[in-house]
Amino acid sequence: MRYAIFAAFLLLGACATAPAQAQAQCPPAGFSRAELDALRAAEWALHDDARRNALALALVRGCLDNPDPGLRDVILFEALSHWLRGQQLTNQTMLAIADNLEPRLAAPEGEGFERPFAALVLSEVARADRIAPYMTDARRRRLLDASIAYFTTVRD
């Protein structure tokens, strides 16, 4: 019986720590803050398409709700805006970003960064679709519905 209880506690402990290990980090793995600052100084020139697309998604996953405005506002938003406006992200990456951000519009308020920055970045994703359509009509409608639902809950 003691072993069963001990095993149960170990299992619960493992479950409790699993999300922390699965959480995305900011700065993303493989990039230091200094490297991201250097990338910004180089006007976001990242010539490896796969690495650029992976970084864009990693920034969204890890930095969107970061309380550091230098990471969230400057690194995340400026990089994504630059790459989206320059049509430097694949359709697959843009859809993955939208898929990551859309549920965040309905997330609990937290520190107050996640929901508004999800909306801000989604506006850039939607703009990219307006310039060069890549979403299906159904996907575009889903994004519109989620955005409207978010905006009706905003109290300032």
Segments and roles (model prediction):
Residues 102, 106-156:
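Eukaryote-skewed repeat-based solenoidal scaffolds used as protein-protein interaction platforms
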Residues 5-14:
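Bacterial N-terminal signal peptides
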Residues 70-86, 116-128:
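Non-membrane alpha-helical segments in proteins
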Residues 67-69, 110-111:
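Short inter-helical turns and helix N-cap capping residues of alpha-solenoid HEAT/ARM repeat scaffolds
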Residues 23-56:
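Extreme N-terminal leader/anchor segments
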Residues 17-23:
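Sec/Tat signal peptide C-region and signal peptidase I cleavage site
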Residues 44-50, 83-94, 126-140:
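Flexible loop/turn segments at the boundaries of HEAT repeats in alpha-solenoid HEAT proteins
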Residues 52-59, 71, 79, 89, ...:
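Structural recognition of alpha-solenoid helical scaffolds
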